């Protein structure tokens, strides 16, 4: 029996590198390089409540750190320390300070430190002068430079300067207008254009005429006129006399009048004596607030509502009408051959059980 040759598996680094590239990855290689073995998972679970310090306990290759392994009993004979070799001590070299090089000074040469300045045109010039002789001085005068730019004219200082400003030209935007025309058979529009002498444009006037060039539907008489049929209108349930107010009299109104009669009880309603009857009949609002007559609008059949501010109560012309916020419409009652006109008012204050306002 021939035994099959056993092929050696690739190294762990090559297998994990191929695993990263998408090849088939052995589960033991993947867990070892990703620190997901059973020992690593136990350390992760136990480390949640235990702390091992810097012991370096794991399934990887341990080196003991930079100082190597140290036994628990201290440094003894059996301890192994891995690290770098001993440091070599080198002797210190003393460096001497070097100063600047000395420059010799010769005090025997009495040279003058004054250097004469001579103007020259580029060549060498030699000046020989004897003591006591006169020296001729020649001065060259050059003309001022000529300015070739535009001439600037300066006028009177008191006059204001005038600057010519040229406006910028902007391109005109294009405007497009669209007109739509729709025919309406309800009316016929007549458009007339009026042109005046010397005018280049015409103004359009639109006239809407009812019945202009219209078509009548129906029978016509021999003269061409349309025959219309007149239908009389019948009225149903129209009272003989129209109502005098916006709210007609009804059964509900009669019940309301009976209820208002109960309000004339002295225990529930305060009765106010009217001294000026003419004002109470024509314009009763003058008892509540200061105002002027408005002849354009007078309607005494409506309820009057006054806008009173609760924080600032103003004085009324009549003390009995103080703090009135509403006056009802006039209520007419007949008793013993007389006609009584009354208005029910409502105050804005609140009265408690202790009679405090």
Swiss-Prot record:
GO CC terms: host cell; host cell endosome; host cell Golgi apparatus; host cell nucleus; viral capsid
InterPro entries: Late_L2
Major localization listed first in the record, in broad terms: virion
Keyword field contains Phosphoprotein: yes
The keyword DNA-binding appears for this protein: yes
GO molecular function: DNA binding; structural molecule activity
Post-translational modification: Highly phosphorylated.
Subcellular location: Virion; Host nucleus; Host early endosome; Host Golgi apparatus
Purpose: Minor protein of the capsid that localizes along the inner surface of the virion, within the central cavities beneath the L1 pentamers. Plays a role in capsid stabilization through interaction with the major capsid protein L1. Once the virion enters the host cell, L2 escorts the genomic DNA into the nucleus by promoting escape from the endosomal compartments and traffic through the host Golgi network.
Known partners and oligomeric status: Interacts with major capsid protein L1. Interacts with E2; this interaction inhibits E2 transcriptional activity but not the DNA replication function E2. Interacts with host GADD45GIP1. Interacts with host HSPA8; this interaction is required for L2 nuclear translocation. Interacts with host importins KPNB2 and KPNB3. Forms a complex with importin alpha2-beta1 heterodimers via interaction with the importin alpha2 adapter. Interacts with host DYNLT1; this interaction is essential for virus intracellular transport during entry.
Name of protein: Minor capsid protein L2
Organism: Bos taurus papillomavirus 4
Gene label: L2
């Amino acid at each position: 029996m021939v035994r099959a040759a056993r092929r050696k598996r690739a190294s762990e680094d090559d297998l994990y590198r191929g695993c990263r590239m998408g090849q088939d990855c052995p589960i033991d290689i993947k867990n070892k390089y990703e620190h997901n073995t059973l020992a690593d998972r136990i350390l992760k679970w136990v480390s949640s409540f235990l702390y091992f310090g810097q012991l370096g306990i794991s399934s990887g290759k341990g080196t003991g750190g930079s100082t190597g392994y140290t036994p628990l009993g201290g440094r003894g004979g059996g301890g192994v320390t891995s690290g770098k070799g001993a440091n070599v001590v080198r002797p210190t070299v003393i460096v001497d300070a070097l100063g600047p090089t000395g420059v010799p000074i010769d005090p025997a040469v009495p040279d003058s430190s004054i250097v004469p300045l001579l103007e020259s045109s580029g060549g060498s010039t030699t000046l020989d002068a004897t003591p006591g002789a006169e020296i001729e001085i020649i001065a060259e005068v050059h003309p001022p430079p000529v300015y070739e730019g535009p001439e600037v004219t300066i006028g009177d200082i008191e006059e204001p300067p005038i600057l010519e400003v040229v406006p910028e030209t902007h391109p005109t935007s294009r405007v497009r207008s669209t007109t739509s025309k729709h025919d309406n058979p309800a009316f016929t529009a007549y458009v007339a254009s009026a042109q005046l002498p010397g005018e280049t444009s015409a103004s359009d006037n639109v006239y809407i005429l009812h019945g202009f060039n219209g078509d009548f539907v129906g029978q016509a008489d021999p003269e061409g006129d349309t025959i219309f049929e007149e239908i009389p209108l019948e009225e149903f349930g129209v009272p003989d006399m129209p109502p005098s107010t916006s709210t007609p009299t009804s059964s509900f109104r009669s019940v309301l009048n009976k209820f208002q009669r109960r309000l004339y009880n002295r225990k529930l309603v305060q009765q106010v004596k009217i001294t000026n009857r003419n004002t109470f009949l024509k314009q009763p609002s003058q008892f509540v607030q200061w105002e002027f007559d408005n002849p354009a609008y007078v309607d005494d059949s409506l309820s009057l509502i006054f806008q009173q501010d609760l924080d600032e109560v103003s004085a009324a012309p009549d003390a009995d009408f103080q703090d009135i916020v509403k006056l009802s419409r006039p209520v007419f009652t007949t008793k013993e051959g007389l006609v009584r006109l009354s208005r029910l008012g409502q105050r804005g204050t609140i009265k408690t059980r202790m009679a405090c306002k």
